[in-house]
Structure formats: C-alpha cells, structure tokens
Amino acid sequence: MHIRSFISKSWANSWPMTLIMFFEFLIGMTDIYIAGRVGKEVQATYGFVVQFYFIFIIIANALSMGTVSVVSRLFTAGDKAALAKTVWSVIITTATVGAVFSVAGIFATHWFMEFINIPVGLKQYGTQLGKIYACGLVFHYLLVSTNGILRSCKMIRSSLLTMAIVCLMNIGLNFIIVFHTRLGFWGIALSTVISVFAGSIVNLWHCRAFMNKARAFSFSVVRNVISIGWPGGATQAMWQVHSMVMFLILSSLPEKSIEILAALAAGIRIESAIFLPAIAFNMANAVIVGNLIGEGKKKDAYRGGLVTMFMGTGIVLLLTVIVIASARWIAPLLSNNETVVAETIRYLYISMLSEPFMALWVILGGGLSGAGDTRSIMFNVIAGIWLVRIPLSYICVVLLGLSAASVWWTMNLSQLIMAVFMTRRYWQRKWLM
C-alpha cells in the first residue's frame, strides 16, 4: 500500500474516534464543572468515585479489546457465520457480567467508602454517587462492547452517532437534574446512567446486522476473546488502582490535601482533551492493524500502525501547546477556589511536557492490541507505573515530605520509560508472528 492509502485508512478510522473521545471529554468536563460549582468537597469526591467506577468498567473494556482483535479479523476474512456467533456470544457475556457487577457495586459501595482512607467529609458524598453509578454499569458494559463491534465492522460512524446522542443527553440532564431538581449533585451520576442506557439500546439495534437467526452462543469464542482481552483488563485494572493509590498518596500531604485532590481531578479532565484523542488513535490503530492482518497483509499492518502513531502524536503535540497557552484561562472555569485553580495550573504546566511520549506508547499499543499482543502492553504498564511512578511518588511525598509537584515530575518520568519500552516492542515485530 502507498503511504497515502495508509493515511487515508488511518484518518477514516481516527477522526470518528477522535470525535467520540471529544464527546467523552465534554461529558467529563461538564461533570467536573458542575461538581466544582456545587463545592470543592463534591468535586474532590467525584474525582475519586469516577476512578472507583471505572474499575468496574475494566471487564467491559477487556472484553471489548478482545472483541476488536477477533471481530476485526473475522470481518475482513469474510466468515459471516463465525462473525455472527462471536457478536452474539460477546453481547450475552457482556450483559451477564455487567449485571453481576451492577449488583456488586450497589452493595459494596458503602463498605468500600467506610474502609478506604479518604477525608471523612468525602465519604457520604462518595457513597451516594457510587451507588447511582453502579446502577448504570450493565448498560455501560453493553455500550462499550457494542461500540467495539461496530468499529471492528467498519460501522464506526454508527458508533459516532450513538455517542453523540449519549453526550447530548448526559450534558443536558446534568444541568437539569443538578440545578433544577431536588436531587442536586446526584444528577452528576444519574445523567450518566440514563444516557448510557439510551446509547446501549441504539447500539444493540445497529448490531442486528451482524447476527443471524440462530443466535448461537459459543464458549470457545468467549474463551478466545477473554484470552486476548484479559491482559488488557489487567492493564486497565493496574492503571485504575494506580490512580486510587496516587489519590491516597496525595491525601497524605500535610497541607492543602483536599485542594490538591480537587486540582488533580480538574487537571485530569483538562488533560483528557489530549489523552482522549490519543486513546481514539489507539482504538483506530487496533482496528486498522486487525483488519489488515485479517486480510493477510502483515507488512501493511506494521506500516499502517506507524502512520497512525505519527498522525496521532502530531495532533497531541498541537493540543499540548494549546493547553499550555490557555491553562490560566481554562482552570478558573472548573473551580471557584483560588488554591485549587493555582494547583491545577501548576499540574498542567508540568504534566503537559510528557504528553507526546504518552501519545507514542498509547497509539503503538493500539496496534499491538489489534494483533492480539496485549501481554506486552501489560508488562509495559507494570514497569512504568508500578516500578517507577508509584514507588517514587510515595518516597517523594510520604518519606521526603516534598510537594505535589514532585509527583507530577515522577509521572513524566514514567511516561518516558513506557514510550521507550513500547517503541522497542513494536520495532521488533515479534507481535506479527
């Protein structure tokens, strides 16, 4: 394939995913904006509860990762019977697991909030938000899974339409419920539940095109999907748990711990303007590489992954410059507390320096995922997060008593290390064998 063909194929998959991630960004920004207007306690609690919530989403993301790898290859190989069996099996499995975790989340939230070491003033807010979010887990599971199916089968624009609906509903309901009903801050979580329910129904309707009347369920298909997806799930689990550990480490700061936590929540939401496009190119790369491998074009799969990485990293670099230039204007929009605003700006100025490295390893990781090489991604995260970021952050804050800025610099170092390891793995091409 000519380089222009790679660029065209990459962009055809990447721009809808970028818009989808932009919708996710708008939802997150709206959540943190509304939480900040309610109060710094709610804003800090929201930042923690969302990390807790997405720990439960990990299984869905793992299944989706395995689904994309399997379905993208089956779709281009032209095996309609195997494709139909895979789609049906994945949907049934996802719905079942999602329902189990919804129930578990509802009953476990109160216990977890009592057990975890966070400021006492945040526990009540966390319990209420957590239980509401748990109610929507089963629908979120279906939404994630069916989005993966649609983009694997070259119906990414249908997925884009669904997420546009989810975005509009989530944002609109957020403002209405929080500010115009007695439910108050509950609306932050309730708007998510309602919108993902609607999105899952729309996507299930689209997925009918890939299912036959037999509705055959296959345990072997599920095992195959899980075997590819579980390292991805483990990777996301380690990432989410690491976020909670970082939250606890920062809670140990002797001064301004709540303000720092609120600033981190706000900073991450602003940073997601950069991170989510990288994830969009990651997901697009998984489909591109998977489709090309399904066609038997391994050399093209390798080159297509590189082209997608360079495109995505270039966009991330541009967005990084924009965020740095506008940080002092954006941060006050998310909080009316002067200390939170100042710490948010400090976080952005430091963390932005490593964004191109983040984009590089995340997007190349998408290509590896599409080929089914999810274990190397897992080992990369273990090295960067659990052997570098967490230990050094603990040493800086707990043992040495340094400020939060030391943690931000430690995060930059870990991004660089992960970029080096992922580039080396991709360049070796062992994942194509």
Where is each model-derived feature located?
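N-terminal transmembrane alpha-helices
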Residues: 2-33, 37-38, 54-66, 70, ...
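Short runs within selected transmembrane alpha-helices of multi-pass transporters and secretion channels
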Residues: 64, 132-151, 159-170, 188-203, ...
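Short alpha-helical transmembrane segments in multi-pass integral membrane proteins
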Residues: 1-17, 71-136, 169, 179-230, ...
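Helix-terminus/linker motif at the lipid-water interface of multi-pass membrane proteins
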Residues: 26-44, 113-120, 176-182, 240-268, ...
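Alpha-helical transmembrane segments of multipass membrane proteins
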Residues: 29-33, 103, 111, 145-149, ...
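Small-residue hotspots at the loop-to-helix junctions and early N-terminal turns
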Residues: 40-51, 126, 130, 189, ...
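Transmembrane helical elements of multi-pass membrane transporters/channels
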Residues: 12-31, 132, 143, 166, ...
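Small-residue-rich hydrophobic transmembrane alpha-helices
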Residues: 43-103, 140-158, 261-327, 359-380
